[in-house]
Amino acid sequence: MESEVAMKSDKKERGQSVLLFAILMPLMSLFLLGILDYMVTNARVMETVAVADLSAHAGAQEITVLPDGTINVTARGNQVAALYFNAQRPSYTQLVSVSCGRVQNRPACLVQAQTRSAGYLLSARWVTVRAIGYLANGVTRGDQ
């Protein structure tokens, strides 16, 4: 008698594990795609930050500061920053603007760039990155 009770199966619970698998599998796939999208986009943003930072510091080295504190800005700083950016940039980034001169009352170069998100789960979009390279004492091209 006990064995008959233990062996009886309830017909109401038939296919429960299949239904659970059918519901959870697409949700897990979406979750994993979301994580992959975030990771690839984050790596792209970090690479764009590195390229923008390098080009901002290269452009800042073209700024000259006179002994009286006057900042001499030429178009050469913008050109050098753009040249460095375009030489190093990955295919999914683009240069938006370069502005070398006085930034926050200090000699610096501001580079603004954009990178495309991965677009695996969400639609691809542009992520804006800004980098400032300040001129440090003794780091102009003439001092090297």
Which stretches of residues belong to each language-model region?
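Alpha-helical assembly-interface signal, strongest on the long, hydrophobic N-terminal helix that forms
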Residues: 2-78
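Short, conserved structural patches
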Residues: 3, 46, 65-144
